[in-house]
Amino acid sequence: MARGAGLVFFVGVWVVSCLAAAPRTSWKRVTSGEDVVLLPAPAERTRAHKLLWAAEPLDACGPLRPSWVALWPPRRVLETVVDAACMRAPEPLAIAYSPPFPAGDEGLYSELAWRDRVAVVNESLVIYGALETDSGLYTLSVVGLSDEARQVASVVLVVEPAPVPTPTPDDYDEEDDAGVTNARRSAFPPQPPPRRPPVAPPTHPRVIPEVSHVRGVTVHMETLEAILFAPGETFGTNVSIHAIAHDDGPYAMDVVWMRFDVPSSCADMRIYEACLYHPQLPECLSPADAPCAVSSWAYRLAVRSYAGCSRTTPPPRCFAEARMEPVPGLAWLASTVNLEFQHASPQHAGLYLCVVYVDDHIHAWGHMTISTAAQYRNAVVEQHLPQRQPEPVEPTRPHVRAPHPAPSARGPLRLGAVLGAALLLAALGLSAWACMTCWRRRSWRAVKSRASATGPTYIRVADSELYADWSSDSEGERDGSLWQDPPERPDSPSTNGSGFEILSPTAPSVYPHSEGRKSRRPLTTFGSGSPGRRHSQASYPSVLW
């Protein structure tokens, strides 16, 4: 059912106090079948007036769970929120006149009731034999002769079913001699359950159950469940945390604040306690009522960490460090674990969780709804896991044969992509091969040209005079000279040479300006570094071209 913000009915003193300036709303719980006395007339009132009792039934809204709400300036009241869709229109129940109102035939009447089992007794509303359908909001209004009607009191009546009596052994007969068992009911008529005295509301906020250990740390936390504010107010939370160590071991404590948005479509927010301890469960990650469920969280709004704590140095006396997300108008309240809202706006409204970790384990937690009156929603704590959101299933038509799947258009595209990739790789391979071939050719040419440029250069045509100094008339000597090293010359240069031969002309050269040059210069070899390998060119008879 879609629920809007305008379909939410608020029950509590904050509605009456802020909107109608009336006294607080009270709560009354009775058992089915009891006689209930509600809303006595106020003691201080004008003489001429009439009293009007009315009711707004809430029996179709399920169980009502009131919560303690703090108003600013500090004040605590019980309140709850119900969906207007489950409510029926207000109904007048009874009216009383003071002095009595004149009726026809010169008669007077002072009370008038429009419903069975309802009467006015001593200017109080009485419901005889209350039923579960009588649960609702009851109001009393006073109307003066010259004033408009004003509401002076209201009460939320919750009628619970009567407990079923359990049978006792006295209600049955023992087995007789024939083995026949005759059960008989008690002859006494059932007695109505004893009337319970009214229970006053607690004077302190609800205490979150703490974690107790024989060893380790016990944490106590106290907090209000809701704070209502008007836009522009500055206020702070009121969380009290006490850590008691049972041994001398050191420990670390983290106080973590988390915030959750409260959608206007939710009549209440459900906090699944099991998900606080196991937030990674599938039911907690995907609850069926995700918008209105608190089962997992993405980030921490504020963290105050205490390190090096012990029995003798409990928080906040141990080393503390605080971190907070940058939220305008939100800050730490001094050096405590509480938050301060400065010039609060509707954007600050939401459901806040305060969780205490001791050595990375949850030891205590509490929740708090901080909002304006128009944004307020109930916060209900559930002990069980939420229902998991069902997986989406594609709808199928029954008794209809599914058509053959059409050929996918992605097939040709994939084939074209594969062929294109193959052609591209082939082109890259050919290009690489061509580049390598060209590079190798250029390298070979460069080496060849370098070798030809550094080779020996001959400046004379070989003739018979070139070998005159080493020629011999004996054929045998000429033949043997091929296998012997030439003798060392006195004018030989140093053994460190380049290995090339310098040919000097010993006869008239074939080039100009060489006539008359009769000096015979020996052919000198600049040795390669080893005297044994140094030799002259004449040692090897050959023809130089």
Swiss-Prot record:
Residues 61-86 are annotated as: Interaction with gI. Residues 436-545 are intravirion. Disulfide bonds join C266-C292, C275-C284, C309-C318. The modification Phosphoserine is found at S471, S472, S498. It is found in: Virion membrane; Host cell membrane; Host cell junction; Host Golgi apparatus membrane. Residues 21-414 are virion surface. Pfam families: Herpes_gE (PF02480), Herpes_gE_N (PF20418). Belongs to the alphaherpesvirinae glycoprotein E family. Interacts with gI; this interaction enhances the Fc receptor function of gE. The heterodimer gE/gI interacts with the Fc part of host IgG. Interacts (via C-terminus) with VP22 tegument protein; this interaction is necessary for the recruitment of VP22 to the Golgi and its packaging into virions. Interacts (via C-terminus) with UL11 tegument protein. This is Envelope glycoprotein E. It comes from Human herpesvirus 2 (strain HG52).
